[in-house]
């Protein structure tokens, strides 16, 4: 399962849509961290094509992966240039795989990359 999520992130780094057809189930539900939800492989492919026309993923570094049964959680750092603006954030992806080893459900969650320490006494 970890190999598949790494392959998926690599698709973004290389702007390579071809492997997505083998990574995702036809009936996948993909929920982005800021609200959009893509229903089915066709919508995921459309989003991938359209996003990559305006943006480039600069980094998608996996920090850790936890897997149990058919479920995987990956913590990562993501950075991109979209419409000329570079931004990045920390995040977590929760993935459920189907019986064929394809991604049936993927949900992303975002956290600020910059942290502050409100109780730091320095």
Predicted feature residues:
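Short, well-ordered alpha-helical segments enriched in acidic and aromatic residues
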Residues: 14-27
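A short gly/proline-enriched turn/hairpin at secondary-structure junctions
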Residues: 29-39, 51-54
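Amphipathic alpha-helical repeat scaffolds
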Residues: 6-10
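A beta-strand edge to alpha-helix "cap/lid" segment located at domain peripheries
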Residues: 45-122
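Amphipathic alpha-helical repeat elements characteristic of tetratricopeptide repeat
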Residues: 2-3
């Amino acid at each position: 399962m970890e190999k598949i999520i790494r392959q998926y992130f690599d698709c973004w780094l290389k702007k390579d849509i071809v492997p997505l057809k083998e990574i995702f189930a036809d009936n996948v539900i993909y929920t982005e961290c800021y609200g959009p939800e893509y229903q089915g492989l066709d919508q995921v492919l459309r989003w991938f094509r359209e996003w990559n026309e305006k943006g480039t993923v600069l980094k998608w570094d996996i920090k850790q992966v936890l897997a149990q049964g058919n479920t995987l959680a990956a913590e990562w750092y993501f950075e991109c240039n979209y419409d000329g603006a570079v931004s990045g954030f920390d995040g977590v992806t929760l993935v459920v795989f189907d019986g064929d080893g394809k991604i049936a459900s993927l949900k992303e969650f975002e956290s600020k990359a910059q942290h502050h320490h409100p109780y730091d006494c320095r």
